[in-house]
């Protein structure tokens, strides 16, 4: 199955709804891993963390340290803004919303084991 925007949004909504329910087993916070820190991934991470008020542990996997948005890029192309003005780092997500930002490539998702393997050799576990 290929992932498109509609599948991503419906999966994100399902994850948010499932994770918002009280935990029946265990005392740890639910784990959500989001792969990709573009406009969609960063926004999903932000709102899951914000709306859960810290009840969900959100990790964002993104190999680059900054993101250059296509929003307002026409202002750069027209000479009204410099290139750095359309760049964003992930520090605000980490500092303001408590999101764990991992700068690495996700190379495999094991849906049965609920883990995400990283290119650097580590792995992340998730709940839903």
Each language-model region and where it sits:
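Core beta-strand elements of the Rossmann-like FAD/NAD(P) dinucleotide-binding domain
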Residues: 122-128
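SH3/SH3-like beta-barrel fold
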Residues: 116-118
């Amino acid at each position: 199955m290929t992932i498109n925007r509609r599948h991503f949004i419906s999966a994100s909504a399902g994850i948010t709804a499932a994770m918002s329910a009280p935990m029946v087993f265990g005392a740890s916070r639910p784990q959500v891993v989001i792969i990709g820190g573009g406009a969609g991934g960063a926004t999903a991470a932000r709102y899951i963390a914000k709306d859960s008020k810290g009840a969900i542990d959100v990790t964002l996997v993104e190999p680059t340290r900054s993101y250059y948005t296509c929003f307002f890029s026409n202002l750069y192309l027209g000479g009204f803004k410099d290139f750095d003005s359309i760049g964003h780092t992930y520090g605000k997500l980490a500092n303001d919303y408590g999101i764990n930002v991992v700068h690495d490539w996700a190379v495999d998702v094991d849906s049965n084991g609920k883990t995400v393997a990283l290119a650097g050799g580590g792995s992340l576990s998730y709940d839903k």
